Amino acid sequence: MMGGFKVQGKSLEAAQELLDSARVVAEAGAFMVVLEGIPAMLADEITKRIPIPTMGIGAGAGCDMQVLVAQDMLGMNDWVPKFVKKYADLRTTIIDAYNTYCEESSARTFPAEAYQYNAKIEGIENLK
């Protein structure tokens, strides 16, 4: 349909095209439609005018449900779209965790005994 990292449906003509497309999708038997990166007032109108639920991502609060990309909302990326609220800043925490894991693995301090299966195998020295 449409795409790119820019707001869609900002003119009356573009808004009508999006509404028409949503209607076609609904008439084709879809169980829902995703509205992404469109003005909130347009998402409200589409939600009112089609018979299936709308899921919004950057489309305002008027959609039937909301979705965000987990990596964006958890602060795992350097850049996030305007519509994303970062609920955490895990990027540094994740990088630090991977660095610590790599250091411990290289130094052979991981896995420590607490993180190993330590079954005693009688006669292991007799393996051929």
Predicted regions and their residues:
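Alpha/beta enzyme core
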Residues: 1-81, 85-88, 92-127
